[in-house]
Amino acid sequence: MSMTPREIVHELNRHIIGQDDAKRAVAIALRNRWRRMQLPAELRAEVTPKNILMIGPTGVGKTEIARRLARLANAPFIKVEATKFTEVGYVGRDVESIIRDLADAAVKMLREQEIQKVKYRAEDAAEERILDALLPAARPAMGFGDEPAREDSNTRQLFRKRLREGQLDDKEIDIEVADNPAGVEIMAPPGMEEMTNQLQNLFSGMSKGKKKTRKLKVADALKMIRDEEAARLVNEEELKARALEAVEQHGIVFIDEIDKIAKRANAGGADVSREGVQRDLLPLIEGCTVNTKLGMVKTDHILFIASGAFHLSKPSDLVPELQGRLPIRVELKALSPNDFERILTEPHASLTEQYRELLKTEGLGIEFAEDGIKRLAEIAWQVNEKTENIGARRLHTLLERLLEEVSFSAADLASEHSDKPIRIDAGYVNSHLGELAEDEDLSRYIL
């Protein structure tokens, strides 16, 4: 990951509108990871990541920033909700399962990368096994010359050509494949995931290496053997060692809804999943060792990004130790009508583009006029102000409502509008949404 903070922000701008402060904070945090890896080993061990706390209303881009960041970093990433966890000793998931899930994510990510690297070798090996099943074993050369061997080679090349062209896809063959019995599914009680994982691994290991002959179509057999050969070519021990390093040095954990575990000043009663969870998170964020399938994972250099709306509580309601472990505070702003307008048009694969392309599959064209987009943005902002502010998610509700009739009758409308697309202008938006937006009671329940 050698992108500069400016390049990271530029990439985030393709998908997320506004929130420049948050983008700069995460870009610097990501670049600092690269900078740390350039340091001498002795100094590198001393440099710890500066964890981030994002504060802002729902639907303004907190989660999306973290999600896009993980894709850019090509790093093990996991998003969890703080409300899913309970204090150790109570029924529910304990916070250490976050690191175990992160380790699983790292293995999955690296395995996919390794399989891509050996893809062509796996395809060649699968092709040879299919040809072995299609053709009898080569006859031993009898008498003088190698005429039969050459004849077999020519036949094999002919079948190889037909196989690659897909002419043999529907032909059935008997092929020996790895025996993968249906996995033993164990419903894990909350907090017992680690034990059930070990039991499942035990049962799956019992049938490892066993083969069985199956009758399959060539196309299905080719895919199955390709996957089997790719898995065989991947060095599992090396993969696990690399995954362990990736988790420890590059892992990113995004903890959403952290405001929901903040103790409110006037709240009473038990705090099984509030203050207790905060105290359990402390060692994880500060740096501790967690036992996982990959071995012992040190969390000292994992980057933690926490986020919350904090509309019923304040960041100061978190326990002081946790506040200290989230030193970088970033406030995300509520969206303005202009932001809504930009969200509808500017991002890569914007909402308007998605609907346009979806309806194009039915042969129906739609065109969003500038005044239509402006009016839609105004309505989204108005409804958010009058009712609950759910940020950019309001646009999904409005667009579904706006295009409901068009989506329902798309196949019928396609023939009527074959030469001219349906134009979504301010008048169209007002006729479909204006009345609902003005009536507060209706908008509260429908929009």
Swiss-Prot record:
Compartment(s) of residence: Cytoplasm
List of residues binding ATP: I17, G59, V60, G61, K62, T63, E64, D256, E321, R393
GO function terms (MF aspect): ATP binding; ATP hydrolysis activity; peptidase activity; proteasome-activating activity
Keywords: ATP-binding, Chaperone, Cytoplasm, Nucleotide-binding, Stress response
Assigned GO CC terms: HslUV protease complex
Main location: cytoplasm
Gene3D superfamilies: 1.10.8.60, P-loop containing nucleotide triphosphate hydrolases
GO biological-process terms attached to the record: protein unfolding; proteolysis involved in protein catabolic process
InterPro entries for this protein: AAA+_ATPase, ATP-dep_Clp_protease_ClpX, ATPase_AAA_core, Clp_ATPase_C, HslU, P-loop_NTPase
The family this protein is said to belong to: Belongs to the ClpX chaperone family. HslU subfamily.
HAMAP family: HslU
NCBIfam families reported for this sequence: hslU, PRK05201.1
The protein's name: ATP-dependent protease ATPase subunit HslU
Organism expressing this protein natively: Pseudomonas paraeruginosa (strain DSM 24068 / PA7) (Pseudomonas aeruginosa (strain PA7))
